[in-house]
């Protein structure tokens, strides 16, 4: 289970589309729980994702989302290939009590945390026994009155944090514009604040091109420069074509 969180517009959905595309490329099944009301099939194709082949769940509330996720996983064939379950997003999924309470109701936040705490225990068993890679997309909130340390937090209580084997914090980096001031791409910083699969606190920088998707070549070259694998004598990608060829790098992977 991986939790992916950032502020609005951080690039989370672009990562979801990329993972769906890779899952489909491997012959797997992608399940998308969508509560953001922001599906964009054309945008998804940029990342190689075919939303028509996705098992789409559009629940009205969190209780329905959890029930339908369990049902979808149980209905999959036992010999199914890689299975991706992406929830976009947890923060945008209200509970029944939140919907009933309306704008001025109280007690809904605590009820949400308790519900998620129970649900995480169930989801953990379902995912671990079904060879499912689960991605939970979340948003950051600012804690009031924090004088020292990181003032940001994620909604949902501690349940998702404990359940996740990997927690990735996404933050924005440098924006890249064209000759006429058009936004062409941006750098995205990914910080592993929790990692049961390896050393924690590792960081990386990737580039998101708004027209072509994630720029894998640039990311590999930038990593090579930072680790002194490549000499930063030239800023152009073309200068490293021979290095990429020697690494047997394939841009589609």
Regions from the language model: what does each represent?
Residues 60-132:
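Phosphate-binding/switch loop-helix module in NTP-utilizing enzymes
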Residues 109-227:
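Phosphate-binding/switch region of NTP-binding enzymes
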Residues 92, 98, 142-147, 231-237:
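N-terminal cationic and glycine-rich segments that engage phosphates or anionic surfaces
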Residues 1-54, 70-74:
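The Walker A/P-loop phosphate-binding site
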Residues 25, 46-54, 101-109, 151-157:
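A short alpha->loop->secondary-structure connector
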């Amino acid at each position: 289970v991986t939790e992916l969180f950032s502020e609005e517009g951080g690039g989370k959905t672009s990562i979801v589309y990329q993972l769906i595309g890779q899952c489909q490329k491997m012959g797997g099944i992608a399940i998308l729980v969508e509560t953001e009301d922001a599906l964009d099939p054309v945008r998804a194709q940029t990342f190689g994702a075919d939303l028509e082949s996705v098992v789409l769940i559009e629940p009205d509330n969190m209780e329905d989302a959890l029930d339908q996720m369990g049902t979808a996983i149980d209905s999959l064939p036992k010999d199914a290939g890689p299975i991706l379950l992406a929830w976009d997003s947890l923060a945008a999924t209200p509970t029944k009590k939140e919907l009933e309470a309306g704008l001025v109701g109280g007690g809904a936040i605590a009820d949400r945390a308790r519900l998620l705490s129970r649900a995480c225990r169930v989801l953990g068993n379902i995912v671990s026994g079904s060879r499912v890679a689960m991605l939970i997309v979340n948003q950051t909130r600012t804690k009031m009155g924090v004088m020292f340390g990181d003032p940001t937090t994620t909604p949902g209580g501690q349940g998702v944090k404990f359940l996740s084997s990997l927690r990735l914090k996404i933050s924005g980096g440098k924006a890249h514009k064209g000759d006429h001031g058009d936004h062409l791409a941006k750098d995205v910083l990914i910080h592993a604040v929790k990692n049961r699969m390896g050393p924690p606190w590792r960081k990386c920088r990737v580039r998101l091109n708004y027209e072509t998707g994630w720029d894998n070549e640039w990311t590999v070259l930038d990593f090579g420069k930072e680790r002194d694998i490549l000499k930063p004598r030239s800023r152009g990608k073309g200068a490293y074509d021979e290095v990429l060829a020697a690494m047997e790098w394939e841009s589609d992977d």
